């Protein structure tokens, strides 16, 4: 059966709004396009509304297969499956590959996270695979195509753009091919550290509250986060060895279509990694530097990779914070 988007009947919406008493309506904090991970590591595979997580699952359960009690060995196999998708990307360091995997984990469970950092793919030359990587990551959040937006030049423009983008509760917001650094626009900073923001809808006089449970991605050559954005963005560096990266021949030129067709398989890999880490007792690295505002994200998207022997996916965050020439401004 094919599903299509449609609005509910106006008369029912009007009756609900005029009724005033909305207590019978369950709270909805987000929409997920795949199964979710519970606090005990169990996977909720049923679609529809989940009163425990307050999420609405919009997916076909039979597309996803996760072991009932995943082990570390299951997690290692799942991680190998995801890393195989990243094999042809020219990551500058292994930590950048780890950050890309963390972005994929974030994409899968973004609706469950109160807040999550933005991910920015950076390279020195055109044709390095920046946009391709962001679109690959986006597939893990939604099987639909994602449209890209231009990065706003000032905070007023940024606020208007974010309100319009967040209004339909999208799984992904993407800023592609940035030509300027990622400025710390106040509205963007809030979206990255607050689960709900308020704003005035364009063309209307009313103010509304909007959920920020959306994965935010960006890419650009020789640009990145500055000042207060450095702690809100996880950079991923690509560094191809070719003089003209755009001429490179790929062994899997149709990778995006491959992943779309087998999305359930690869999303299940990400869920297996997180669930196995939780079932193992949620082991943490005591000496790991904390990333303020993103403790929940670190628990579910950072520590599992360290547990599996991968570099810290947030290492670049601390490097950029230290090296930022404008950090005192």
Walk through the language-model features, giving the residues of each.
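Context-gated lysine
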Residues: 1, 11, 38, 54, ...
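Conserved glycine-centered beta->alpha loop in an early N-terminal alpha/beta scaffold
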Residues: 1-86
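Generic detector of short, locally flexible boundary/turn motifs and exposed helical patches
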Residues: 2-4, 9-13, 70, 83-89, ...
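N-terminal start-of-chain detector that recognizes signal peptides
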Residues: 6-10, 16-18, 27, 74-77, ...
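Feature primarily recognizes SF3-like P-loop helicase cores of small DNA viruses
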Residues: 23, 97-103, 112-119, 140-192, ...
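Short, mixed-charge, low-aromatic patches
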Residues: 31-41, 56-64, 89-95, 118, ...
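Structured loops at beta-to-helix junctions and adjacent beta-edge loops in soluble globular domains
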Residues: 40, 107, 124, 219-220, ...
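P-loop NTPase catalytic core of nucleic-acid-dependent motor ATPases
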Residues: 48-170
């Amino acid at each position: 059966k094919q599903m299509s988007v449609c609005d509910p009947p106006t008369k029912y919406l009007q009756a609900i709004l005029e009724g005033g008493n909305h207590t019978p309506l369950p709270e909805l904090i987000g929409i997920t396009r795949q199964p979710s991970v519970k606090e005990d590591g169990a996977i909720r595979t049923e679609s529809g509304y989940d009163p425990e997580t307050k999420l609405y699952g919009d997916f076909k359960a039979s597309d996803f297969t996760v072991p009932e009690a995943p082990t570390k060995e299951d997690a290692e196999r799942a991680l190998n499956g995801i890393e195989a998708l990243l094999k042809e990307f020219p990551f500058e360091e292994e930590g950048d590959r780890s950050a890309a995997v963390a972005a994929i984990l974030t994409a899968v469970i973004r609706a469950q996270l109160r807040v999550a950092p933005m991910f920015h793919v950076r390279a020195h030359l055109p044709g390095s695979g920046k946009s391709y990587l962001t679109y690959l990551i986006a597939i893990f959040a939604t099987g639909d195509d994602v449209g890209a937006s231009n990065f706003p030049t000032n905070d007023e423009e940024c606020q208007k753009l974010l309100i319009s983008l967040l209004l339909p509760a999208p799984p992904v917001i993407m800023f592609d091919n940035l030509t300027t650094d990622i400025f710390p626009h106040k509205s963007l900073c809030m979206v990255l550290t607050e689960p709900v923001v308020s704003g005035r809808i364009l063309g209307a006089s009313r103010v509304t509250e909007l959920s920020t449970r959306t994965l935010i991605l960006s890419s650009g050559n020789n640009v990145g986060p500055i000042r207060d954005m450095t702690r809100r963005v996880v950079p991923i560096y690509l560094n191809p060895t070719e003089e003209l990266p755009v001429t490179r021949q790929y062994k899997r030129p149709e990778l995006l279509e491959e992943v779309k067709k087998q999305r359930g398989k690869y999303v299940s890999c990400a869920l297996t990694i997180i669930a196995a880490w939780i079932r193992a007792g949620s082991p943490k690295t005591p000496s790991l530097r904390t990333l303020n505002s993103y403790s929940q994200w670190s628990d579910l998207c950072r520590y599992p990779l360290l547990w599996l022997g991968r570099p810290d996916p947030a290492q670049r965050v601390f490097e950029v914070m230290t090296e930022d020439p404008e950090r005192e401004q």
